[in-house]
UniProtKB/Swiss-Prot annotation:
Presence of the UniProt keyword Cell inner membrane in the record: yes
Oligomeric and partner information: The complex is composed of two ATP-binding proteins (DppD and DppF), two transmembrane proteins (DppB and DppC) and a solute-binding protein (DppA). MppA can replace DppA as binding protein for heme and ALA transport.
Protein name: Dipeptide transport ATP-binding protein DppF
Gene giving rise to this polypeptide: dppF
Short name of one Pfam family: oligo_HPY
Length: 334
């Protein structure tokens, strides 16, 4: 097998047991405690596919996005791009991270420098990371603007002169200027009007087909996720509780938390009715999580081991679920 063939068989992006713990002290003499914002998350992202990461605010999904782009460094775990270790502190790994993994932020009003024109915003990554001439940078910026539906005359305008949807198109174009393979999309449409969300989503899907992009799509909106995802990872308090294909998650959710999230999602078909599952209480504090399963205080299927032990992901026909109740359903004799 050639080196190229071996590379193509590897996941494009692979995370193994990624962790991010923040030390916290409440007073000068208080003992240091840890907030486990991310606590052992693993996944494989294949070329040209979209992995959606979903969950309530505070579940750790945005922290995961920051780790994947090295905005923050993980406390532990491993991260590979086509088999190459991205956590090595060497110039080659850093260059690879900058060029091959880019991010599109949630807020198009805050992520663009108001003092710079669109052309300057788009050319800045090229100015920092390439040796292209001024004319070459301009040519590439105009080409990318056309790809995202912006006009040539927009090149010399400032961000405040655009609508929210147009600003997010600028942000997407900026994220693609270095020809990345992976784009981390952190709630890319949540700050937009409903009327333009579908346009931006369709643009992202068209760009994925045209450029062969892979997305890690972070969202709390399952109706949006259903439109764009190939695989879905459900997170709760820093951990993955369920992972599977889009069809598995939406048609046969196994974890009680996933079931509750989906029951709250509006359906287009009025005949497609689900039992409304109402969760009691709020997301626990990551500074003081409950013993056992972090979801046990809100779970309607809680029983003995849920309050004592932390469930691990188990494979049920290709669908990974971390739940003692599901395990009991599959193995009632235990």
């Amino acid at each position: 097998m050639s080196t190229q063939e071996a590379t193509l068989q590897q996941p494009l992006l692979q995370a193994i047991d990624l962790k991010k713990h923040y030390p916290v002290k409440k007073g000068m003499f208080a003992p240091e405690r840890l907030v486990k914002a991310l606590d052992g998350v693993s996944f494989n992202l294949e070329r040209g596919k979209t992995l959606a990461v979903v969950g309530e605010s505070g579940c750790g999904k945005s922290t995961l996005g920051r780790l994947l782009t090295m905005i923050e460094m993980p406390t532990g775990g491993e991260l590979y791009y086509q088999g190459q270790d991205l956590l090595k502190h060497d110039p080659q790994a850093q260059k690879l991270r900058r060029q091959k993994i880019q991010i599109v932020f949630q807020n198009p009003y805050g992520s663009l420098n108001p003092r710079k024109k669109v052309g300057q915003i788009l050319e800045e990554p090229l100015l920092i990371n390439t040796s292209l001439s001024k004319e070459q940078r301009r040519e590439k910026a105009l080409s990318m603007m056309a790809k995202v539906g912006l006009k040539t005359e927009h090149y010399d305008r400032y961000p405040h002169m655009f609508s929210g949807g147009q600003r997010q198109r600028i942000a997407i174009a900026r994220g693609l200027m270095l020809d990345p393979d992976v784009v981390i999309a952190d709630e890319p449409v949540s700050a937009l009007d409903v009327s333009v969300r579908a346009q931006v989503l369709n643009l992202m899907m068209d760009l994925q087909q045209e450029l062969g992009l892979s997305y890690v799509f972070i969202s709390h909106d399952l109706s949006v996720v259903e439109h764009i995802a190939d695989e879905v990872m459900v997170m709760y308090l820093g951990r993955c509780v369920e992972k599977g294909t889009k069809d598995q998650i939406f048609n046969n959710p196994r974890h009680p938390y996933t079931q509750a999230l989906l029951s709250a999602t509006p359906r287009l078909n009025p005949d497609d009715r689900r039992e409304r599952i109402k969760l009691s209480g709020e997301l626990p504090s990551p500074l003081n999580p409950p013993p056992g399963c972090a979801f046990n205080a809100r779970c309607r299927r809680r029983f003995g081991p849920c309050t004592q032990l932390q469930p691990q992901l188990k494979d049920y026909g290709g669908q990974l679920v971390a739940c003692f109740a599901v395990d009991q359903d599959e193995n009632p004799q235990r």
